[in-house]
């Protein structure tokens, strides 16, 4: 059932479980990239997609209440909070002499705090009446931060300040992370929303979007092995989504080729 005017089906996968799995996978991927740079994109990039899937799942739940601003807006808010938190997590250890290995955990903690504050602000003074807005903003901030930092770490080959600044910020890769991760978080439910929405189909598209983000980063990095593996995974997952969509559709109409002249 849908809440308000949103429209999502029954929940097949508990949100907190999806969130925990996405968070753990993305953090593991960052540490793999830090300790084994040669596998940064192959493993780190793949596992960073987990944060995108978890973020998309939370977007599905909160957006079903009817945000009034459209589903994409909350995806952009997620990545806005996430970018601030990820950068703080990277820069604070070098500024205060903390261990570099604390970076992913520190970024996650900051993201939770930022998300909670933003969630409270959406209640008062903004006045949104969505009952789960505070918890959802907190979760989206966390997933946004882990997705941003995960893909940037995979590209840069580590999460120390010098690696991230030179390998992801100065070259603009963090902007790519913002857009790729943002689309992966906001698009799945935005594409599947409606009276016939199913959790399985939306999550399948979320996985496909996360894998596409990984593929984009693999291409940008020119990592041939990661490109091939990501492309195979994405084609299989997106193909599964298309089959589900055709199977769930009431009717499928194939548009013929447009006439070349009147």
Swiss-Prot record:
Pfam families: MtrC (PF04211)
Main location: membrane
Alphabetized UniProt keyword annotations: Cell membrane, Membrane, Methanogenesis, Methyltransferase, One-carbon metabolism, Transferase, Translocase, Transmembrane, Transmembrane helix
BP GO terms, sorted: methanogenesis, from carbon dioxide; methylation; one-carbon metabolic process
EC category: translocase
Keyword check for Membrane: yes
Chain ranges passing through the membrane: 35-57, 70-92, 97-119, 140-162, 172-194, 214-236
Catalytically driven reaction(s): 5-methyl-5,6,7,8-tetrahydromethanopterin + coenzyme M + 2 Na(+)(in) = 5,6,7,8-tetrahydromethanopterin + methyl-coenzyme M + 2 Na(+)(out)
Biological or metabolic pathway of the protein: One-carbon metabolism; methanogenesis from CO(2); methyl-coenzyme M from 5,10-methylene-5,6,7,8-tetrahydromethanopterin: step 2/2
Recorded topology in the membrane: Multi-pass membrane protein
A GO molecular-function descriptor: tetrahydromethanopterin S-methyltransferase activity
Described function: Part of a complex that catalyzes the formation of methyl-coenzyme M and tetrahydromethanopterin from coenzyme M and methyl-tetrahydromethanopterin. This is an energy-conserving, sodium-ion translocating step.
Subunit structure: The complex is composed of 8 subunits; MtrA, MtrB, MtrC, MtrD, MtrE, MtrF, MtrG and MtrH.
Similarity annotation: Belongs to the MtrC family.
Entry protein name: Tetrahydromethanopterin S-methyltransferase subunit C
Lineage: Archaea, Methanobacteriati, Methanobacteriota, Methanomada group, Methanococci
Gene name of this polypeptide: mtrC
